[in-house]
């Protein structure tokens, strides 16, 4: 489920930002929000986190600031954003569309794309590519597991990395 926010004060807004996405999301969805308006205000907050969690949403990714991050953490509701902020969106940013194509960090995201997120970052994949990407990621993870095992067995880092260097340089498209 996607949401697009822009800067400014809406002429007429029939609803609070992101609420339609919360109510339209299927159980297990992640809400992804384009909030590249340039306005330093929250595009997501605590009440939305509770509403989303109650409706079965698994988490939120916002390309911009979010507020009430500690509250979301206490709920066990993942919120991944560019930065925390206390300033609300009221009169500063509003929703222009949801369940639409958006851009996150220069990457095209459409409803139905798969989202992987953790404290290291966020990845968006077209659903058709998930199986292949997971297969390749498993291969990389196994190689890294063996490298760590060798280091713990006493091998020198230059040797371990050196043995794997050429493969590590290979970009997987």
Q: Where in the sequence are the language-model features?
A:
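C-terminal binding/interaction regions
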Residues: 115
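Channel- or pocket-lining gating/hinge segments that regulate access to a cavity or pore
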Residues: 121-123
């Amino acid at each position: 489920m996607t949401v697009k926010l822009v800067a400014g004060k809406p002429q007429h807004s029939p609803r609070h930002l992101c609420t339609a996405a919360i109510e339209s999301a299927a159980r297990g969805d992640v809400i992804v929000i384009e909030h590249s308006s340039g306005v330093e205000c929250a595009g997501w907050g605590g009440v939305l986190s509770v509403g989303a969690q109650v409706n079965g949403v698994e988490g939120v990714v916002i390309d911009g600031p979010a507020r009430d991050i500690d509250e979301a953490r206490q709920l066990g509701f993942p919120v991944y954003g560019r930065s925390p902020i206390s300033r609300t969106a009221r009169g500063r940013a509003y929703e222009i569309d949801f369940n639409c194509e958006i851009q996150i960090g220069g990457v095209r995201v459409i409803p139905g794309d798969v989202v992987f997120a953790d404290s290291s970052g966020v990845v968006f994949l077209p659903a058709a590519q998930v199986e292949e990407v997971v297969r390749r990621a498993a291969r990389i993870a196994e190689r890294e597991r063996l490298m760590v095992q060798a280091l713990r067995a006493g091998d020198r880092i230059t040797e371990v990395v050196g043995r794997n260097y050429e493969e590590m340089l290979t970009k997987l498209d």
